[in-house]
From Swiss-Prot:
Protein name (database record): 2,3-bisphosphoglycerate-dependent phosphoglycerate mutase
InterPro entries attached to this UniProt entry: His_Pase_superF_clade-1, His_PPase_superfam, PG/BPGM_mutase_AS, Phosphogly_mut1
Residues the entry annotates as binding (2R)-2,3-bisphosphoglycerate: 8-9, 15, 21-22, 60, 87, 90, 98, 114-115, 182-184
Subunit record text: Homodimer.
Catalytic activity of the protein: (2R)-2-phosphoglycerate = (2R)-3-phosphoglycerate
GO BP terms, alphabetized: gluconeogenesis; glycolytic process
Protein family according to the UniProt entry: Belongs to the phosphoglycerate mutase family. BPG-dependent PGAM subfamily.
Entry EC number(s): 5.4.2.11
Naturally occurring in which organism (per UniProt): Burkholderia pseudomallei (strain 1710b)
Organism domain of life: Bacteria
Keyword Transit peptide attached: no
Entry keyword set: Gluconeogenesis, Glycolysis, Isomerase
Length: 249
């Protein structure tokens, strides 16, 4: 049996402000830093260790990983940074308040943009300052692979090559693997691992800063999965994530 640990970054400044973030490189709040440290403590207390870690190229995930490594005294563990683990690109919604957007377009439309499998938000214009083309962290990524908007289906398509070519082989080689990433890049991976349908993926909500453990068989098919920590608090955090895209009315 193999184990794989996933963690969504701690609360970011735009999580706190209930804004669509996507590829915008915002940092953690103090609460987010605290969540990440607590995640590291939980993992250490539960006896976990890691041989390699994967994260995105966005600081909220990177800093979360730093905190986890620090708490576990694993700062030496090699880290793979990949744009393929970035959050889903929210296109023209990037930076907008989720509740205000829902009040303008309706809860149903915003739910479709946030959680449907194959409907992306409106795209950025190529010349928009939020477009990734001029960002040095993507200098080696072919321009045609860089998105101006994404649905979850698109996110799955960019996450899976990293899983198939690097993460899965590491797990099968017996390495203890940690992935510190984002709500939708993790939803994309979980959809693939658990075989969740396009319709049912809408209901999957991942809380910030809580370690999610997957136990996998020899073919990397999930046997079971579970969150570490206070289960009641985790359930409340998942419910809060589900409420983010609804209007205040």
């Amino acid at each position: 049996m193999y184990k794989l640990v996933l963690i969504r970054h701690g609360e970011s400044t735009w999580n706190k402000e209930n804004r669509f973030t996507g590829w915008v490189d915002v940092d953690l709040t103090e609460q987010g830093n605290r969540e990440a440290r607590q995640a590291g403590q939980l993992l250490k207390e539960a006896g976990y260790t890691f041989d390699i870690a994967y994260t995105s190229v966005l600081k909220r995930a990177i800093r979360t990983l730093w905190h986890v490594q620090d708490q576990m005294d694993l700062m030496y563990v090699p880290v793979v940074h990949s744009w393929r683990l970035n959050e889903r690109h929210y296109g023209a919604l990037s930076g907008l308040n989720k509740a205000e957007t829902a009040a303008k377009y309706g809860d149903e439309q915003v739910l479709v943009w946030r959680r449907s499998y194959d409907t992306p938000p409106p795209a950025l214009e190529p010349g928009d300052e939020r477009a990734p083309y001029a960002d040095p962290r993507y200098a080696k990524v072919p321009r045609e692979q860089l998105p101006l908007t994404e649905c979850l289906k698109d996110t799955v398509a960019r996450v899976l090559p990293l899983w198939n070519e690097s993460i899965a082989p590491a797990v099968k080689a017996g390495k203890q693997v940690l992935i510190a990433a984002h709500g939708n890049s993790l939803r994309a991976l979980i959809k693939y691992l658990d075989g969740i349908s396009d319709a049912d993926i809408v209901g999957l909500n991942i809380p910030n800063g809580v370690p999610l453990v997957y136990e996998l068989d020899e073919s990397l098919t999930p046997i079971r999965h579970y969150y570490l920590g206070d289960q009641e608090a985790i359930a409340k955090a998942q419910a809060a994530v589900a409420q983010q895209g609804k209007s205040a009315a």
